[in-house]
A protein has these predicted regions:
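Bacterial carbohydrate/catabolite-sensing allosteric modules
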Residues: 1-181
Length: 181
């Protein structure tokens, strides 16, 4: 999966919707998180926005339950200028939405938010999340093809081919069009 492009697509979507102060929440201890951050930065820079490391929340596996929520909530309490949040995944997005709801922040009226993974979670709430889909059929097809090649005598060296799958933006109702304000 091209996670860099996924992070780019989400951030670019928010920019196109008129957002100018976009917080990024990314996982520091895995490749996907770093690639999604890279895409976020690329979209900001392409739009002429200054990258601000203070607008990025980095978390690790061991603090994923608390740090993303407490950090974004604290940014709101500190009156940090922000109008959108790009999240590492759907689960983190909904955790942050819960924390923001507790302090009276309404999604998407007050703040837009995106996820990543297009998980079942993204569609089980009244708020459907704008997210990135993993093309499951394509992944299954590629896995099957690799398995067939292996069964038919393909060498392990031949199997080390890297495939980059294109991410797909799934539009929900978690983002407000700020161009209409």
């Amino acid at each position: 999966m091209d996670d860099c492009k996924g992070g780019y697509l989400l951030t670019k979507y928010l920019i196109n919707m008129g957002h100018q102060h976009i917080v990024g929440v990314f996982k520091a201890d895995d490749h996907q998180g770093r690639e999604r951050h890279k895409g976020y930065v690329m979209a900001l820079q392409e739009a002429g926005y200054q990258y601000d490391p203070d607008m990025v929340v980095w978390f690790h596996t061991e603090d994923r339950q608390t740090k993303p929520v407490t950090s974004v909530v604290q940014m709101i309490k500190d009156q940090r200028k922000m109008d959108a949040v790009v999240c590492y995944n759907d689960q983190i997005a909904f955790s942050i939405i819960g924390g923001l709801h507790q302090i009276g922040v309404s999604i998407p009226e007050d703040l837009s938010i995106t996820g990543y993974d297009n998980s079942m979670l993204a569609h089980q709430h009244p708020l459907s999340l704008t997210t990135i889909a993993h093309p499951q059929e394509k992944l299954g097809e590629m896995a099957g093809q690799l398995l067939l090649e292996k069964i038919q005598g393909g060498s392990d060296k031949d199997m080390k081919t890297e495939y980059l799958i294109e991410p797909k933006l799934v539009i929900g109702n978690s983002c407000k069009n700020r161009n209409q304000e």
